[in-house]
Amino acid sequence: MQNIDFISEAEAKKLLEELSCKIAAYNHAYYIEDNPLVSDAEYDQLVNINLKLEQQFPHLVLENSPSKEVGAKIANKFVKVTHQVPMLSLSNAFDEQDVRDFVDRIKNFLRLDEFAPIFCEPKIDGLSFSAIYKNGLLITGATRGDGYVGEDITANIKTIKNFPHKIDNAPECLEVRGEIYIEKQDFLNLNEEQEEQGRDQFANPRNAAAGSLRQLDASITAKRPLKYFVYSGGVTEQNLASSQDQLLTKLKKFGFSVNEISKLTKSEEEIFAFYEYLKTNRENLPYEIDGVVYKLNDFELQNRMGFIARSPRFATAHKFPAIIGQTKLLSITVQVGRTGTLTPVAELEPIEIGGVTVSRATLHNFQEIVRKDVQIKDYVFLQRAGDVIPKITGADIEKRPNDTIAFEAPLFCPSCNSKLYYVPEDIIIRCDNGLNCPAQHYERIRHFVSKNAMDIAGLGRKQVEFLIAKGLISNPLDIFFLKKNNEASLIKLENMDGWGQKSVEKLLKNIEKSKNVSLPRFIYALGIRHIGEQNAKLLAREFGSYNNFIAQMELLSKNDSDIYQKLNNLEGIGDKILIDIIAFLDVKENIQLIKKLGEILNIEDYKETRAQSSLTGKIVVFTGSLPTISRAEVKATAEKLGAKVAASVSSNTDLVVAGLDAGSKLQKAKELNIKIIDEEEWLTLIKNA
């Protein structure tokens, strides 16, 4: 930590201004973008320096001081929800002395002679939430946001397994608060799926949980393995309990998930013993924790202590030290993904960190290497502070050998040697050689057979590599001729190393089974850049059948403006995605592949099971902020009733639902004489639909 004991007033003023800007930027990245720029340890250090400076120079405290803020101002993505009781963050304790000071402050504030019982519980590394129930029914779920105003995630929170939608014998009004998280193994599985689908991997479980929960489309959230714990109440019409331990017992009876690993302590020694127990056993827990939370157990004493601007006086978080290791960077290799994106990978001298032996770590992108000043043969720092996958935080410059080599981003693809292209807006380097690039070729086949695409069990990474190397397959189409090619081969697959009669028979059976495929899966399996499962479903819904899909794709490849505008009007599809689709279609082999696959596969027409309603087949546009319903929920309801939700107003639009601050879409609807209704009329419409 920076030595500020002897800092001058002028230096302190300058440093406080710098810290205010830095911490505000880090808050925005963490709370709004779900993309932390620094580790928790680095962030906590900056906040602590800021706090100590303000204590030394109270007359220098800034109007926008980080000590007055909780998180970050919320994004405009969701409907805003004001917390009736602010959801404040906790102050931090970094060592035993900080904890003793916390206990002493309680005694001094309340004028207690004896130790007041402290309730201790793990600090879950997830996303804070609030859920409000009226007469036992869940009516609002919200994120913490900036502590005063959060985001409405009601539709998303309802998708979490075992999250109560209704509570028996509940008070008229009940608010619970807690943490939503993803377990370690679920996180690893999720990242595997992300990789198979050609999507960016999540940096850590917290990012994955936050990114999953803050989806405008709740159906995406529903597919993610989110879990939760409740740990406190907010607004309630009646007192549920007189202490923290009693409250958790009551909430558990209501059906909420409560963390059983907690302890009511009656001395400082018991506090420290519990902290050491969790610190020692944290790796054995299925979820990530980054410390222990200490709260005054008695609610009456909590009320007496109250709050300061940023946090409650009656609670603090005792943080674990970051798990850090140091090892040598042997080399940097470059991987080529399915869509041609290049990713630098650090090859390391094996090191055990956090109970895991690490020999490789992603460097994310080439700008990261420059920003962190990492060179080959450097001794680099690895950290696991809430991360399942260790990350390189930087190089030990003082130990830098004389023979280090600065890494230079490649100009040519390491797989096919074609010229590479830099994509500034995505901060990536890409190979555009498509199927002529062996690495993309391999990754494309891997994607084609993956679980959420054609779902051909028995064709994993090793099997695909083997079949390509032996010349048995060279593109997705060849998979369906594997039986024929194998029969014509001099050496049969079942006689080769790693294979047998039963495994080959099982594989061929799975290939045959996969020939019956839904249109969304088929479109997703093609591996078009930015066409994930959700966008594949959007396209399938628009086209309805394979025949219509291929016909429209051929028109699009010929720059047909009508089909371009039609697709551009779909919610979720825009210019950027259309450019990627056209780039895919510009490769003649891709159109041919789609046609040939269409000849041998049974591609089922798109069908969505829903009751007929007055909205079936209607094109609906939502504009402005709806006062009581989130955009995700209103869109899901419309689609469930058979409507198509469009992103813009056109002459084909049947209905416009206008909320607060509706803009150009509302004006255009008036010009085109399209029916316009408000939220209240919409609720009546769907009730009677």
From Swiss-Prot:
Give the protein's recorded name.
DNA ligase
CDD domains for the chain: BRCT_DNA_ligase_like, LIGANc
Give the InterPro entries listed for this entry: BRCT_dom, BRCT_dom_sf, DisA/LigA_HHH, DNA_ligase, DNA_ligase_AS, DNA_ligase_CS, DNAligase_adenylation, DNAligase_N
Identify the residues that bind Zn(2+).
413, 416, 431, 437
Asked if Nucleotide-binding is a keyword of the record, the answer is no
> Which positions bind NAD(+)?
40-44, 89-90, 121, 144, 179, 295, 319
Alphabetized SMART domains for the sequence: BRCT, LIGANc
Q: Which SUPFAM superfamilies match?
A: BRCT domain, DNA ligase/mRNA capping enzyme, catalytic domain, Nucleic acid-binding proteins, RuvA domain 2-like
* One annotated GO biological process: DNA replication
| Cofactor(s) required for function per UniProt | Mg(2+); Mn(2+)
Active site per database record = 123
